[in-house]
Amino acid sequence: MMQPKKTKFRKAHKGRIHGVASSGATLSFGQFGLKAMAPERITARQIEAARRALTRHMKRVGRVWIRVFPDVPVSKKPAEVRMGSGKGSPELWVVRVKPGRILFEIDGVNDQIAREALTLAAAKLPIKTRFVARIAE
Protein backbone atom coordinates (compact mmCIF):
# COMPACT_ATOMS: atom_id res chain seq x y z
CA MET A 1 0.00 0.00 0.00
CA MET A 2 1.21 3.50 -0.78
CA GLN A 3 1.67 6.02 2.03
CA PRO A 4 4.20 8.73 2.90
CA LYS A 5 7.28 7.73 4.88
CA LYS A 6 7.12 10.90 6.97
CA THR A 7 4.64 13.78 7.25
CA LYS A 8 4.76 17.21 8.82
CA PHE A 9 1.48 16.63 10.70
CA ARG A 10 -0.20 13.38 11.82
CA LYS A 11 -3.78 14.46 11.12
CA ALA A 12 -5.37 16.55 8.37
CA HIS A 13 -8.59 18.52 8.00
CA LYS A 14 -11.34 16.97 5.90
CA GLY A 15 -11.14 19.69 3.24
CA ARG A 16 -13.12 20.13 0.04
CA ILE A 17 -12.20 19.50 -3.59
CA HIS A 18 -12.84 22.62 -5.69
CA GLY A 19 -12.21 23.35 -9.35
CA VAL A 20 -10.50 21.31 -12.05
CA ALA A 21 -6.97 19.92 -12.22
CA SER A 22 -4.41 22.32 -13.65
CA SER A 23 -1.36 20.15 -13.04
CA GLY A 24 -1.26 16.48 -13.97
CA ALA A 25 -4.03 16.87 -16.55
CA THR A 26 -2.08 15.76 -19.63
CA LEU A 27 -0.27 12.53 -20.54
CA SER A 28 3.42 12.82 -19.63
CA PHE A 29 4.90 9.32 -19.84
CA GLY A 30 2.73 6.76 -21.65
CA GLN A 31 0.62 6.57 -24.80
CA PHE A 32 -2.65 5.82 -22.99
CA GLY A 33 -4.15 7.01 -19.72
CA LEU A 34 -7.10 7.07 -17.36
CA LYS A 35 -8.52 10.53 -16.61
CA ALA A 36 -10.76 11.38 -13.64
CA MET A 37 -14.06 13.04 -14.55
CA ALA A 38 -15.33 13.93 -11.05
CA PRO A 39 -13.90 15.16 -7.72
CA GLU A 40 -13.32 12.32 -5.25
CA ARG A 41 -11.08 11.00 -2.49
CA ILE A 42 -9.35 7.82 -3.68
CA THR A 43 -7.78 5.52 -1.08
CA ALA A 44 -4.44 3.73 -1.27
CA ARG A 45 -6.28 0.37 -1.36
CA GLN A 46 -8.33 1.44 -4.38
CA ILE A 47 -5.20 2.60 -6.22
CA GLU A 48 -3.48 -0.72 -5.45
CA ALA A 49 -6.52 -2.75 -6.61
CA ALA A 50 -6.63 -0.80 -9.88
CA ARG A 51 -2.86 -1.25 -10.38
CA ARG A 52 -3.16 -5.03 -9.90
CA ALA A 53 -6.05 -5.27 -12.37
CA LEU A 54 -4.02 -3.24 -14.87
CA THR A 55 -0.80 -5.26 -14.64
CA ARG A 56 -2.59 -8.62 -14.65
CA HIS A 57 -4.53 -7.82 -17.81
CA MET A 58 -1.39 -6.49 -19.54
CA LYS A 59 0.36 -9.76 -18.53
CA ARG A 60 3.33 -7.72 -17.29
CA VAL A 61 4.09 -6.45 -20.80
CA GLY A 62 4.61 -2.73 -21.19
CA ARG A 63 4.98 -0.10 -18.50
CA VAL A 64 2.58 1.42 -15.93
CA TRP A 65 2.86 4.82 -14.28
CA ILE A 66 0.72 5.76 -11.26
CA ARG A 67 0.29 9.54 -11.41
CA VAL A 68 -1.38 10.02 -8.01
CA PHE A 69 -0.05 9.43 -4.50
CA PRO A 70 -2.16 9.14 -1.32
CA ASP A 71 -0.68 11.77 1.00
CA VAL A 72 -3.71 12.85 3.08
CA PRO A 73 -4.39 10.92 6.31
CA VAL A 74 -8.03 10.16 7.17
CA SER A 75 -8.71 9.68 10.87
CA LYS A 76 -11.44 7.49 12.32
CA LYS A 77 -12.75 6.86 15.81
CA PRO A 78 -13.19 3.25 16.96
CA ALA A 79 -16.66 1.66 16.87
CA GLU A 80 -19.06 2.41 19.76
CA VAL A 81 -17.02 5.31 21.14
CA ARG A 82 -18.86 8.35 22.50
CA MET A 83 -18.55 11.72 20.81
CA GLY A 84 -15.91 14.12 22.01
CA SER A 85 -12.50 13.41 23.55
CA GLY A 86 -10.56 14.50 20.48
CA LYS A 87 -10.02 13.44 16.93
CA GLY A 88 -9.57 9.75 16.08
CA SER A 89 -6.29 8.18 15.03
CA PRO A 90 -5.19 8.05 11.36
CA GLU A 91 -6.85 5.07 9.68
CA LEU A 92 -6.09 5.28 5.96
CA TRP A 93 -4.43 7.43 3.30
CA VAL A 94 -6.24 9.14 0.44
CA VAL A 95 -5.51 11.42 -2.49
CA ARG A 96 -7.88 14.27 -3.34
CA VAL A 97 -8.49 14.01 -7.08
CA LYS A 98 -9.89 16.90 -9.11
CA PRO A 99 -11.73 16.43 -12.43
CA GLY A 100 -9.30 16.21 -15.35
CA ARG A 101 -6.48 14.58 -13.39
CA ILE A 102 -4.61 11.68 -15.03
CA LEU A 103 -4.61 8.71 -12.63
CA PHE A 104 -2.74 6.02 -14.57
CA GLU A 105 -0.61 5.93 -17.72
CA ILE A 106 0.47 2.88 -19.70
CA ASP A 107 2.76 2.24 -22.66
CA GLY A 108 4.14 -0.69 -24.63
CA VAL A 109 0.78 -2.31 -25.47
CA ASN A 110 -1.65 -1.88 -28.37
CA ASP A 111 -4.81 0.25 -28.29
CA GLN A 112 -7.25 -2.61 -27.64
CA ILE A 113 -5.34 -4.13 -24.70
CA ALA A 114 -4.78 -0.66 -23.22
CA ARG A 115 -8.50 0.14 -23.43
CA GLU A 116 -9.49 -3.20 -21.84
CA ALA A 117 -6.89 -2.91 -19.07
CA LEU A 118 -7.84 0.66 -18.16
CA THR A 119 -11.55 -0.26 -18.17
CA LEU A 120 -10.80 -3.04 -15.65
CA ALA A 121 -8.79 -0.59 -13.53
CA ALA A 122 -11.60 2.00 -13.71
CA ALA A 123 -14.04 -0.55 -12.27
CA LYS A 124 -11.95 -0.64 -9.08
CA LEU A 125 -12.20 3.13 -8.56
CA PRO A 126 -15.14 5.04 -6.97
CA ILE A 127 -15.09 7.65 -9.69
CA LYS A 128 -16.22 8.21 -13.28
CA THR A 129 -13.19 8.06 -15.59
CA ARG A 130 -12.34 8.41 -19.27
CA PHE A 131 -9.82 6.60 -21.49
CA VAL A 132 -7.39 9.05 -23.12
CA ALA A 133 -4.77 8.45 -25.80
CA ARG A 134 -1.88 10.56 -27.01
CA ILE A 135 -2.53 12.01 -30.46
CA ALA A 136 -0.19 10.51 -33.08
CA GLU A 137 2.43 13.09 -34.01
UniProtKB/Swiss-Prot annotation:
CDD domains: Ribosomal_L16_L10e (cd01433). SUPFAM superfamilies: Ribosomal protein L16p/L10e. One of its GO terms (molecular function) is rRNA binding. Keywords: Ribonucleoprotein, Ribosomal protein, RNA-binding, rRNA-binding, tRNA-binding. The keyword Oxidoreductase does not apply. It comes from the Bacteria. The keyword tRNA-binding applies. GO terms for cellular component: cytosolic large ribosomal subunit. One of its GO terms (biological process) is translation. Binds 23S rRNA and is also seen to make contacts with the A and possibly P site tRNAs. NCBIfam families: rplP_bact. Part of the 50S ribosomal subunit. HAMAP family: Ribosomal_uL16 (MF_01342). Belongs to the universal ribosomal protein uL16 family. This is Large ribosomal subunit protein uL16.
